Protein backbone atom coordinates (compact mmCIF):
# COMPACT_ATOMS: atom_id res chain seq x y z
CA UNK A 1 0.00 0.00 0.00
CA UNK A 2 1.49 3.36 -1.07
CA UNK A 3 4.89 1.75 -1.87
CA UNK A 4 6.08 4.76 -3.89
CA UNK A 5 6.05 7.00 -0.81
CA UNK A 6 8.86 5.26 1.10
CA UNK A 7 11.60 2.72 0.43
CA UNK A 8 10.90 0.18 3.15
CA UNK A 9 8.34 -2.61 3.10
CA UNK A 10 6.64 -1.14 6.18
CA UNK A 11 5.20 2.29 6.69
CA UNK A 12 7.44 4.70 8.62
CA UNK A 13 7.36 3.44 12.19
CA UNK A 14 7.43 6.81 13.92
CA UNK A 15 4.43 8.31 12.16
CA UNK A 16 2.36 5.14 12.40
CA UNK A 17 3.09 4.96 16.13
CA UNK A 18 2.12 8.44 17.30
CA UNK A 19 -0.54 9.17 14.64
CA UNK A 20 -3.47 7.10 13.33
CA UNK A 21 -2.47 4.94 10.36
CA UNK A 22 -4.54 5.19 7.16
CA UNK A 23 -6.08 8.28 8.71
CA UNK A 24 -9.28 9.27 6.94
CA UNK A 25 -12.25 11.00 8.53
CA UNK A 26 -15.68 12.21 7.48
CA UNK A 27 -15.66 15.91 6.63
CA UNK A 28 -15.32 18.57 3.97
CA UNK A 29 -12.23 19.81 2.13
CA UNK A 30 -11.30 22.83 0.02
CA UNK A 31 -8.22 22.70 -2.16
CA UNK A 32 -6.58 24.62 -4.96
CA UNK A 33 -3.36 26.02 -6.39
CA UNK A 34 -1.85 29.51 -6.32
CA UNK A 35 1.28 29.99 -8.42
CA UNK A 36 3.48 27.06 -7.38
CA UNK A 37 1.75 26.43 -4.09
CA UNK A 38 -0.90 23.75 -3.55
CA UNK A 39 -3.15 24.21 -0.54
CA UNK A 40 -5.84 22.20 1.21
CA UNK A 41 -8.19 23.12 4.05
CA UNK A 42 -10.32 20.56 5.86
CA UNK A 43 -13.00 20.36 8.52
CA UNK A 44 -13.21 16.74 9.64
CA UNK A 45 -14.38 14.54 12.50
CA UNK A 46 -11.99 14.83 15.42
CA UNK A 47 -10.17 12.38 17.65
CA UNK A 48 -11.51 10.44 20.63
CA UNK A 49 -9.29 11.08 23.68
CA UNK A 50 -10.65 7.94 25.31
CA UNK A 51 -7.97 5.92 23.49
CA UNK A 52 -4.93 8.16 23.94
CA UNK A 53 -2.15 6.22 25.67
CA UNK A 54 1.56 6.11 26.49
CA UNK A 55 2.69 3.78 23.70
CA UNK A 56 0.88 5.45 20.80
CA UNK A 57 0.09 8.99 21.99
CA UNK A 58 -3.03 9.82 19.87
CA UNK A 59 -2.39 6.98 17.42
CA UNK A 60 -5.38 4.95 18.60
CA UNK A 61 -7.72 7.93 18.82
CA UNK A 62 -9.13 7.80 15.31
CA UNK A 63 -12.89 7.38 15.12
CA UNK A 64 -13.68 4.20 13.23
CA UNK A 65 -14.04 4.56 9.47
CA UNK A 66 -17.50 3.92 7.99
CA UNK A 67 -19.04 3.85 11.46
CA UNK A 68 -20.90 6.65 13.24
CA UNK A 69 -18.53 9.60 13.70
CA UNK A 70 -19.00 12.05 16.55
CA UNK A 71 -18.84 15.47 14.87
CA UNK A 72 -19.51 17.43 18.07
CA UNK A 73 -16.05 19.00 18.03
CA UNK A 74 -14.54 18.81 14.51
CA UNK A 75 -10.86 19.18 13.70
CA UNK A 76 -9.30 21.89 11.55
CA UNK A 77 -6.61 20.83 9.09
CA UNK A 78 -4.43 22.85 6.72
CA UNK A 79 -1.81 21.69 4.22
CA UNK A 80 0.57 23.67 1.98
CA UNK A 81 2.98 22.30 -0.65
CA UNK A 82 5.60 24.14 -2.70
CA UNK A 83 6.90 22.65 -5.95
CA UNK A 84 8.63 25.59 -7.62
CA UNK A 85 11.98 23.83 -8.01
CA UNK A 86 12.25 20.94 -10.41
CA UNK A 87 12.28 17.63 -8.59
CA UNK A 88 11.75 19.20 -5.18
CA UNK A 89 8.58 19.27 -3.11
CA UNK A 90 8.37 20.91 0.31
CA UNK A 91 5.25 20.79 2.45
CA UNK A 92 3.79 21.37 5.86
CA UNK A 93 0.56 20.56 7.70
CA UNK A 94 -1.31 21.83 10.74
CA UNK A 95 -3.99 20.01 12.75
CA UNK A 96 -6.05 21.29 15.69
CA UNK A 97 -8.87 19.61 17.57
CA UNK A 98 -10.47 20.05 20.99
CA UNK A 99 -11.06 16.36 21.56
CA UNK A 100 -12.93 16.13 24.88
CA UNK A 101 -16.46 16.33 23.43
CA UNK A 102 -15.70 13.55 20.92
CA UNK A 103 -15.14 11.05 23.70
CA UNK A 104 -17.11 7.83 23.81
CA UNK A 105 -17.34 8.57 27.56
CA UNK A 106 -18.00 12.35 27.59
CA UNK A 107 -19.09 12.35 31.24
CA UNK A 108 -15.47 11.68 32.25
CA UNK A 109 -14.25 14.83 30.51
CA UNK A 110 -16.55 17.50 31.91
CA UNK A 111 -14.62 20.74 32.35
CA UNK A 112 -11.82 19.69 30.00
CA UNK A 113 -10.98 20.33 26.34
CA UNK A 114 -7.91 18.11 25.75
CA UNK A 115 -6.79 20.11 22.68
CA UNK A 116 -4.51 18.31 20.22
CA UNK A 117 -2.17 20.35 18.03
CA UNK A 118 0.00 18.67 15.40
CA UNK A 119 2.61 20.23 13.12
CA UNK A 120 4.28 18.31 10.29
CA UNK A 121 6.92 19.22 7.74
CA UNK A 122 8.27 17.10 4.91
CA UNK A 123 10.39 17.33 1.80
CA UNK A 124 11.20 15.10 -1.15
CA UNK A 125 13.78 15.42 -3.90
CA UNK A 126 13.89 13.33 -7.07
CA UNK A 127 16.73 13.80 -9.54
CA UNK A 128 16.14 13.61 -13.30
CA UNK A 129 14.95 10.11 -14.23
CA UNK A 130 14.52 9.40 -10.49
CA UNK A 131 18.07 8.10 -10.23
CA UNK A 132 18.47 9.60 -6.76
CA UNK A 133 15.60 10.06 -4.30
CA UNK A 134 15.74 11.61 -0.84
CA UNK A 135 12.98 12.25 1.68
CA UNK A 136 12.71 13.80 5.14
CA UNK A 137 9.81 14.39 7.49
CA UNK A 138 9.05 15.68 10.97
CA UNK A 139 6.00 15.44 13.24
CA UNK A 140 5.54 17.39 16.47
CA UNK A 141 2.44 17.02 18.61
CA UNK A 142 1.10 18.73 21.71
CA UNK A 143 -1.74 17.58 23.96
CA UNK A 144 -3.21 20.20 26.27
CA UNK A 145 -4.30 19.13 29.75
CA UNK A 146 -2.31 15.93 29.35
CA UNK A 147 -1.82 15.66 33.11
CA UNK A 148 -5.59 15.68 33.69
CA UNK A 149 -6.20 13.05 31.01
CA UNK A 150 -3.43 10.90 32.49
CA UNK A 151 -5.13 11.07 35.88
CA UNK A 152 -8.48 10.10 34.34
CA UNK A 153 -6.82 7.15 32.59
CA UNK A 154 -5.20 5.92 35.79
CA UNK A 155 -8.58 5.91 37.54
CA UNK A 156 -10.22 3.85 34.79
CA UNK A 157 -11.08 0.27 35.80
CA UNK A 158 -9.09 -2.22 33.73
CA UNK A 159 -12.30 -4.10 33.01
CA UNK A 160 -13.51 -1.26 30.78
CA UNK A 161 -10.83 -1.98 28.20
CA UNK A 162 -9.84 1.68 28.04
CA UNK A 163 -6.21 2.78 28.54
CA UNK A 164 -5.04 3.14 32.13
CA UNK A 165 -1.69 4.73 31.29
CA UNK A 166 -0.30 8.25 31.30
CA UNK A 167 -0.44 10.29 28.10
CA UNK A 168 2.39 12.55 26.96
CA UNK A 169 2.11 16.29 26.65
CA UNK A 170 4.43 16.15 23.62
CA UNK A 171 5.24 13.47 21.05
CA UNK A 172 7.74 13.73 18.22
CA UNK A 173 8.94 11.84 15.17
CA UNK A 174 11.51 12.69 12.51
CA UNK A 175 13.19 10.68 9.80
CA UNK A 176 15.19 10.84 6.61
CA UNK A 177 16.01 8.37 3.86
CA UNK A 178 17.93 8.37 0.60
CA UNK A 179 18.26 5.81 -2.18
CA UNK A 180 20.11 5.49 -5.48
CA UNK A 181 18.98 3.44 -8.47
CA UNK A 182 21.97 1.23 -9.23
CA UNK A 183 20.08 -0.14 -12.21
CA UNK A 184 20.90 3.15 -13.98
CA UNK A 185 24.46 1.88 -14.45
CA UNK A 186 23.16 -0.81 -16.81
CA UNK A 187 20.99 1.27 -19.11
CA UNK A 188 17.45 2.62 -19.15
CA UNK A 189 15.88 -0.80 -19.69
CA UNK A 190 17.45 -2.29 -16.57
CA UNK A 191 15.14 -2.82 -13.57
CA UNK A 192 15.13 -0.14 -10.90
CA UNK A 193 16.95 -1.25 -7.77
CA UNK A 194 17.26 1.22 -4.90
CA UNK A 195 19.65 0.38 -2.07
CA UNK A 196 18.80 2.96 0.59
CA UNK A 197 19.68 4.23 4.03
CA UNK A 198 17.12 5.46 6.55
CA UNK A 199 17.34 7.11 9.94
CA UNK A 200 14.31 7.50 12.18
CA UNK A 201 13.64 8.75 15.69
CA UNK A 202 10.33 8.83 17.49
CA UNK A 203 9.08 9.11 21.04
CA UNK A 204 5.39 8.93 22.00
CA UNK A 205 6.40 10.17 25.48
CA UNK A 206 8.77 12.97 24.48
CA UNK A 207 7.51 15.12 27.35
CA UNK A 208 5.45 13.46 30.05
CA UNK A 209 2.01 14.77 30.90
CA UNK A 210 1.42 13.17 34.27
CA UNK A 211 0.81 15.03 37.51
CA UNK A 212 3.77 15.33 39.86
CA UNK A 213 3.29 13.75 43.25
CA UNK A 214 5.31 14.26 46.45
CA UNK A 215 8.09 11.78 47.13
CA UNK A 216 7.06 8.96 49.42
What is each PLM-predicted segment?
Residues 31-39, 47-49, 81-91, 125-132:
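Secondary-structure boundary elements
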Amino acid sequence: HEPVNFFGVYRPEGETTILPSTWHETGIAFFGKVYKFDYELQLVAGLDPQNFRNTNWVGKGRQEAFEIDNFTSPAFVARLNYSGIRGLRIGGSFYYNQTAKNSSKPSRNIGHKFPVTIFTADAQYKSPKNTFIARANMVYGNLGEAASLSEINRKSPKATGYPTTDVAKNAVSYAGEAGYNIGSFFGEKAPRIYPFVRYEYYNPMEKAGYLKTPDA
